[in-house]
Regions:
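Conserved acetyl-CoA pyrophosphate-binding loop and the N-cap/start of the following alpha-helix
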Residues: 89, 93-101
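A short beta-loop-alpha structural element at the N-terminal edge
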Residues: 3-17
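Conserved beta-strand in the GNAT
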Residues: 52, 58-67
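Conserved GNAT acetyl-CoA-binding A-motif
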Residues: 106-117
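Conserved GNAT-fold acetyl-CoA-binding loop/helix
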Residues: 16-41
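Conserved acetyl-CoA binding element of GNAT-fold acetyltransferases
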Residues: 75-87
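Conserved active-site alpha-helix within GNAT-family acetyltransferase domains
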Residues: 96, 120-139, 145
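A short helix-loop-beta-strand connector motif used in the catalytic cores of GNAT acetyltransferases and
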Residues: 40-52, 79
Length: 154
C-alpha cells in the first residue's frame, strides 16, 4: 500500500513540525516558524522536491531532494539531502517508500541518478541505502569548504 505522495503547501504546518524534529535530531535548535518559512520557500520557488509519508492523514516522514548537475557528464542528478521518519513510525517501511519516490522522480525527470551522503556512524542509513539499491561511491573524496561566518551564526 502506497503511503507517500508529493508535498503541497497544504502540508506546511505538519511538515514544518517534522522538519523541526529532523533538525533537532541533528542537534539544531528547535524553530518551527523558521522551518515553515524555509519549506514554504522551497515549495513555492520549486527549489526542491519534497515527498511525504502519511498514516491516517498525519505526516510521519519526508524526503527532500535538490537538483544538481554534472558538467562533465552533461546530466542532472538529484541530491537526496533530507530523509526523516518520526521515531514512533520507524521500522515500518516509510523510509523505503520515500526512497522509492526519489528514484521515481529520477526516472520521470530523466536524471542520471540520486546521490546522497550519510555519516559513517549512521548504522541504520548505511544498511538502508544499499538495501534500496544505492552503491557506496569510493572513487572520489568528498571535501567541504565551510563559510565559518555563516556556520558560526547557525
Amino acid at each position: 500500500m502506497k503511503n507517500t505522495r508529493k508535498a503541497t503547501s497544504q502540508d506546511l504546518v505538519q511538515l514544518a513540525k517534522l522538519f523541526d524534529q529532523y533538525r533537532v535530531f541533528y542537534n539544531k535548535e528547535s524553530d518551527i516558524p523558521a522551518a515553515e518559512i524555509f519549506l514554504k520557500d522551497r515549495i513555492e520557488n520549486k527549489d526542491s522536491e519534497i515527498f511525504v509519508a502519511e498514516k491516517d492523514g498525519r505526516l510521519v516522514g519526508f524526503v527532500q531532494l535538490y537538483p544538481i548537475f554534472s558538467s562533465t557528464r552533461m546530466c542532472r542528478y538529484w541530491l537526496l539531502n533530507d530523509l526523516y521518519v518520526n521515531e514512533n513510525h520507524r521500522g515500518k517501511g516509510y523510509s523505503k517508500e520515500l526512497i522509492e519516490e526519489a528514484k521515481e522522480l529520477c526516472r520521470l525527470s530523466k536524471a542520471s541518478g540520486v546521490l546522497l551522503e550519510t555519516g559513517k556512524s549512521n548504522d541504520i542509513g548505511n544498511q538502508l541505502y544499499p538495501a534500496c539499491g544505492f552503491e557506496l561511491y569510493n572513487s572520489v573524496n568528498f571535501y567541504e569548504w565551510a563559510n565559518k561566518q555563516l556556520i558560526n551564526d547557525k
